A protein has these predicted regions:
Chain A
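Thiamine diphosphate
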Residues: 1-143, 196-197, 325, 329-350
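Flexible, low-complexity linker and terminal segments
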Residues: 2-18, 219-350
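Short coil/turn connectors at secondary-structure junctions
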Residues: 28, 55-59, 78-80, 99-105, ...
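Short catalytic-loop micro-motif centered on adjacent basic/acidic residues
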Residues: 34, 107-109, 183-188
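Conserved active-site and cofactor/substrate-binding residues in soluble primary-metabolism enzymes
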Residues: 39-44, 56, 87, 91, ...
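Glycine-rich ThDP/TPP pyrophosphate-binding loop and its adjacent helix/strand module
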Residues: 116-117, 121-132, 137, 141-283
Length: 350, 599
């Protein structure tokens, strides 16, 4: 068994604006089961952060508990990391973000971590609009504890030993839309062409960006009868659009037919260009997105792509009017303004 | 692209770059692993079967394998394949008992070999082991050919030649006729040999044709003749100031020999540019390290002499100019000529073939360059029972080519003597075996060392220049050899893909440290090469293409910079990738694949 990936790399490996190669964004070698979809998502995160030329130390990666939540060890080895408690990534991340808004926050979670034990935390983070990228590596089971159905498991889906799930699934995408997330996407670990730009768009989004990424569990949920297997997802995947992320006004090229492109400029200047694959889908209309999702779900389709985007999001700091400077850069006087200041606040609340 | 054809060994053989590039197709990674395991004798025997002279070649081989070595494409320098071979030779134990026995019962066929260089000796070994009676003729007093008469002792000690020539001539089946110059091929054929192998080399040194050459003849020497005299001990001194003309390996041996025989101011002068010189880079380095300057772009114009004694040489300064077709011409710069004083000149400007002893009316045809007309594969001449090899076949090459020719000629001679078609060649012997030992365990060391190439230790220069018999290179000790051996990427441990098992999870794509693997839509090769995870720009390396995947895509692996680390196979959930050791041995008359065993 190899514990180290050789540092030798392709002689033509390109570098980004920082002079770093993609390999500089990797973490330690994965200990997940070979073939786990989560590893592909890690690779997509590496690719996306490298392409954006983000200095690794500007990223904070936080997670809960589960195979998915282990993955931050396997990417961005030079970033900040916090492996929290089961289902509690959202609150820890919210705290971190309040203390230092200058980092780029990436929360990695599982369907068990977010839709079962952590559902409450998930909901409140979405409502509050914490500026972050929230990725759920969704395999429909508790992989780490050997494959029990999770709350995203489809009704009727079969477990490896034959048991059938009788409970209704939670659709985290619908929930995120409902709860006010300002960037909502779904993707598949087996389609990096789609996933990498979605992660880039999420990282540049200045509000809460949620990606539900279906990620087959090869050990416990990749069999016939599962609705989260590689084969099932490939067969039922309906992409609504293909996203490209630009940082300049690259002219629309011939590969896009006129009228087929939706463009959204985000707050940081990034340009999201979506090539429409479905006529009746409008990614800037939240209600329409919810309807669209419900309609296609009823048809048995797994809708993927950038489903909703609000180019002018507000985040938690906007709502609270907090100071822009990270707390660790404020001096004692600013952090602890004294009893006179406290008196003033109390008086205002009386 | 069409899926890669794995029914022939070609694809996987090419992946083992070193073995593919070796004219004798030595199974390099196998012997390197054996060296790492301390199994020097086993490593020696693998070499002995393939290249016959491991101790000699481990010091002198032209090493076409090294520029081909994959390691040189993922870091700075290739594995020191050649010098590791010497480690096997230096550290081996008794080997005679491991060599196949020479049959006591002869097959009744008699073969004559003209010359006792590496080509003839290879023919003799391969055929003697099959029960042939082989007669080897050489004009010199010992076997070895140029290995003995030309290559200086400071690069190749006599004991090594004696030992390895002895493994051929000293075990029966081979009758040597030394001090015997063959004067007539016709007469030789008349002696009733079943076949004759001509391995007489390219024995004539090219002449220098400038004014003053004849007048100063006493101090102007043809390089290969001079080296032979040095080798025999007939020449023991040279003047203090020596000019060596020529840019090949012979020039390098001349100048370094001169440094050891009293030459204090020795310089090499070449017509062309330094970069274009024929000498191997390491030979040039060795010469310059010994204080020998190499002066380039100087064309010999005149020899200066006084009273029949050489005093110096005049050179014209030239520069390289390229015409519209990109051909290089050397044109005078117009600067004044330069003169170098000297006491001796060694002329090493090329070698030529000469076959004065072969009659032109016996049916053996020559081409217009004076070389025999041969079938390039069988080495058969226009006389069906006469075969050529080594420098005599296609002009001067090197030892390993002579050996490779020897093997092929032996196969041809054997087929010929059996009355079979010499063009119907026996297949190489090929084995593929999975290296899987456990879930993530391999029977080879798949960790990739990141060490840079280790230098071979040299003897102190003071001692080296004092005596021409002192070998300059000391060779790797066991510890250095181990470390150098670990640099080998085990390119023979092949990544073998089974599309039926693949679930297209991308695990292998993500883990590959050198971005070799892509799953994509099929297309024409030119197009496909641009669409891979890393563009496949090295056209000399093949793509491995497999179809039969569920999504209808193809798996494309660019073999170019694969580290053979096995990570793809470790990260594959279904065993669609397997690491399999590919072992290929070319057919030898006496061993696997030979007609003798097959019929
Ligand atoms: C100075 C020098 C240095 C070299 N260094 C290297 C090196 O480091 N590495 C390398 O790989 N190669 C080297 N070479 C080249 C290498 O020596 C030859 O390519 C190789 O020896 C050719 O082998 P062969 O069997 O064809 O013939 P040779 O080795 O040339 O042997 C031919 C033999 O045939 C004999 N012979 C010729 N005519 C007759 C006849 N009519 N009757 C009887 N005997 C005859 C000759 O006496 C000679 O012994 C070097 C060559 C030179 C000149
Ligand atoms: C508080 C608490 N309850 C239960 C567990 C046991 N546990 C560990 S991981 C896990 C489920 C993880 O599922 P998911 O988030 O889908 O991750 P996956 O392994 O499938 O990627 C559970 C229930 C725990 N670690 N902590
Ligand atoms: S148990 Fe499932 S989710 Fe966990 S590592 Fe294995 S394949 Fe991935
Ligand atoms: S790395 Fe080893 S096996 Fe590969 S080409 Fe070089 S010597 Fe041969
Ligand atoms: S790891 Fe195995 S199953 Fe997965 S894509 Fe590669 S070969 Fe196919
Ligand atoms: Mg899960």
């Amino acid at each position: 068994m190899s514990y180290l990936k050789p540092t030798l790399h392709h002689p033509k490996l390109p570098t980004n604006a920082l002079g770093l190669t993609r390999r500089d964004y990797e973490g330690s070698i994965s200990t997940l089961c070979a073939g786990c979809g989560h590893d592909s998502i890690s690779a997509a995160i590496v690719q996306a952060v490298w392409e954006l030329s983000i200095p690794p130390h500007r990223v904070a990666k936080l997670s809960g508990i589960g195979c998915s939540s282990k993955t931050p060890d396997y990417f961005l080895g030079a970033s900040h990391g916090f492996n929290s408690v089961h289902g509690r990534m959202p609150s820890v991340l919210t705290g971190a973000n309040l203390a230092n808004r200058e980092l780029i926050y990436l929360g990695v979670s599982g369907d068990g971590d977010s839709a079962s034990i952590g559902l409450g935390q998930f909901a409140h983070l979405m409502r509050r609009g914490v500026n972050m990228t929230y990725i759920v590596e969704n395999n429909g089971v508790y992989g780490l504890t050997k494959g029990q159905f999770s709350a995203t498991s489809d009704k009727g889906s079969k477990a490896k030993k034959g048991a059938v799930n009788t409970d209704e699934p939670i659709d985290l995408v619908a929930l995120a839309l409902e709860l006010g997330a300002t960037y909502v996407a779904r993707s598949f670990s087996g389609d990096k062409d789609q996933l990498v730009p979605l992660i880039k768009g999420a990282l540049t989004h200045q509000g809460v960006a949620f990606i539900d990424c279906i990620s087959p569990c090869v050990a416990f949920n990749n069999h016939e009868g599962s609705t989260k297997s590689y084969d099932y997802v490939r067969e039922h995947n309906e992409a609504v659009n293909r996203l490209d992320v630009f940082f300049d006004r690259t002219p629309i090229t011939a590969s896009y037919a006129p009228g087929e492109v939706t463009e959204v400029t985000q707050h940081d200047g990034s340009l999201l260009r979506m090539r429409k694959l479905h006529e009746d889908h409008d990614p800037t209309d939240r209600v329409a997105a919810l309807n669209y999702l419900a309609r296609h779900k009823a048809m048995g389709e797994i809708v993927t792509g950038l489903l909703y985007i609000d180019p002018h999001p507000e985040d938690l700091h906007d709502h609270l009017g907090t100071v822009a400077t990270p707390l660790n850069r404020l001096d004692d006087a600013a952090l602890c303004p004294g009893s006179a200041a406290l008196e003033k606040i109390n008086a205002a609340l009386r | 692209m069409r899926p890669t054809d794995l029914t022939t060994p070609t694809h996987f053989h090419k992946v083992v770059d070193c073995q593919w590039a070796c004219p004798a197709h030595t199974p390099v990674p196998e012997y390197i692993r054996l060296i790492a395991a301390g199994r020097y004798t086993d490593a020696y025997m693998i070499n002995w079967h393939s290249n016959v002279f491991p101790g000699i070649l481990g010091r002198t081989c032209d090493r076409p394998c090294e520029p081909a070595c994959r390691r040189g494409r993922v870091e700075e320098e290739p594995v020191a394949i050649c010098r590791l071979k010497r480690v096997a030779a230096d550290n081996k134990e008794e080997v005679l008992s491991r060599m196949p026995p020479v049959p006591a019962l002869k097959n009744g066929k008699r073969i004559a070999c003209v010359g006792a260089g590496p080509a003839s000796l290879t023919v003799a070994r391969d055929l003697a082991l099959l029960g042939y009676e082989v007669h080897v003729y050489d004009a010199e007093a010992r076997g070895g050919g140029f290995m003995w008469t030309q290559i200086p002792r400071f690069r190749l000690p006599e004991s090594v030649i004696e030992e390895e020539v002895g493994y051929i001539t000293g075990r029966g089946g081979v009758v040597t006729h030394y001090n015997h110059r063959v004067q007539s091929l016709k007469a030789l054929l008349d002696e009733g040999f079943d076949a004759v192998f001509v391995g007489c080399g390219a024995p004539r040194g090219r002449e220098l044709d400038v004014p003053g050459r004849q007048e100063a003849a006493a101090n102007i020497h043809i390089g290969i003749e001079w080296l032979a005299k040095v080798s025999f001990g007939h020449v023991e001194r040279v003047g203090k100031r020596v000019i060596v003309l020529g840019g090949g390996n012979t020039a390098m041996d001349c100048c370094r020999s001169a440094r050891r025989l009293g030459g204090e101011d020795v310089k090499v002068i070449v017509r062309s540019g330094f970069e274009e010189m024929k000498a191997s880079p390491w030979e040039k380095e060795d010469a310059m390290r010994e204080g020998i300057p190499i002066l380039n772009y100087l064309v010999p114009k005149r020899v200066l002499h006084e009273n029949g004694r050489l005093t110096g040489m005049v050179f014209e300064k030239v520069k390289a100019e390229y015409d519209a077709k990109g051909r290089r011409n050397l044109v005078p710069t117009g600067e004044p000529d330069v003169t170098y004083d000297c006491d001796d000149v060694l002329v090493a400007i090329g070698q030529e073939n000469a076959f004065p002893w072969i009659e032109r009316d016996i049916g053996l045809e020559f081409d217009r360059w004076g070389l025999p007309k041969l079938d390039p594969v069988t080495l058969q001449s226009t006389l069906p029972n006469v075969f050529f090899g080594g420098d005599a076949a296609f002009g001067p090459k090197n030892i390993i080519w002579a050996v490779a020719h020897g093997h092929e000629a032996a196969v041809s001679i054997d087929l010929h003597c059996r009355g079979e078609d010499v063009r119907d060649r026996p297949d190489p012997h090929v084995r593929m075996a999975s290296q899987k030992m456990g879930i993530h365990e391999w029977s080879y060391d798949n960790d990739v060392s990141i060490d840079l190439r280790y230098k071979v230790p040299h003897v102190e220069e003071r001692l080296a220049l004092r005596d021409i018999r002192v070998e300059v290179e000391l060779g790797y000790d066991r510890e250095l050899a181990y470390k150098e051996a670990q640099r080998c990427l085990n390119c023979d441990v092949q990544t073998v893909f089974n599309a039926k098992l693949c679930i297209e999870c991308d695990g292998c794509v993500d883990i590959c440290p050198t971005d070799c693997i892509t799953f994509t839509e099929n297309g024409e090769e030119d197009d496909l090469r641009t669409r891979l995870k890393a563009p496949a720009i090295n056209r000399s390396q093949d793509l491995y293409v497999a179809d039969g995947l569920k999504t209808g895509r193809v798996m494309v692996k660019d073999e170019d910079v694969c580290l053979h680390c096995g990570l793809c196979a470790e990260r594959c959930p279904t065993g669609a990738w397997d690491m399999q050791k590919f072992y290929l041995e070319t057919a030898k008359t006496y061993a696997n694949g030979a007609r003798a065993c097959r019929s």
